[in-house]
Swiss-Prot record:
Family annotation (SUPFAM superfamilies): IHF-like DNA-binding proteins (SSF47729)
Entry keywords, A to Z: DNA recombination, DNA-binding, Transcription, Transcription regulation, Translation regulation
A molecular function GO annotation: DNA binding
GO biological process: DNA recombination; positive regulation of metabolic process; regulation of DNA-templated transcription; regulation of translation
Lineage: Bacteria, Pseudomonadati, Pseudomonadota, Alphaproteobacteria, Hyphomicrobiales
Cellular component aspect of the GO annotation: cytosol
PANTHER family, per the entry: DNA-BINDING PROTEIN HU (PTHR33175), INTEGRATION HOST FACTOR SUBUNIT ALPHA (PTHR33175:SF2)
Subunit structure as annotated in this protein's UniProt entry: Heterodimer of an alpha and a beta chain.
Family the UniProt entry places it in: Belongs to the bacterial histone-like protein family.
Protein name as catalogued: Integration host factor subunit alpha
Function per UniProt: This protein is one of the two subunits of integration host factor, a specific DNA-binding protein that functions in genetic recombination as well as in transcriptional and translational control.
Domain of life: Bacteria
Length: 104
């Protein structure tokens, strides 16, 4: 398993190479898409990218947690979190890739 992290710059480079836009235009396009995803989530809208994943905002209620160092209970305030649910197509691609590496 690799520990490579794909960055915005990496995505822009791929767009530049495969689409033929300049690097500046590619970076702007990647930024535009990511900003639109963020803005949709801030508005409380789900973002479904077919064959990839669904991002949703979920409300979490207040609950009692525990400080792992001291063991003291403390309230955890209510908040909104983003959830990521991988599409079955993505899950299958990852599984197939894993199986192919296991055979080597």
């Amino acid at each position: 398993m690799t520990s490579k992290t794909v960055t915005r710059a990496d995505l822009a480079s791929v767009v530049c190479r495969k689409v033929g836009l300049s690097h500046t235009e590619s970076a702007a396009l990647v930024e535009l898409v990511l900003n639109e995803i963020c803005n949709s989530l801030v508005r409380g809208e789900a973002v479904k990218l077919s064959s990839f994943a669904t991002f949703q905002v979920r409300n979490k209620n207040e609950r009692i947690g525990r400080n792992p160092k001291t063991g003291v209970e403390a309230p955890i305030s209510p908040r909104r979190v983003v959830t990521f649910k991988a599409a079955n197509v993505l899950k299958q691609r990852i599984l197939n890739s894993h199986r192919a590496r296991q055979k080597k």
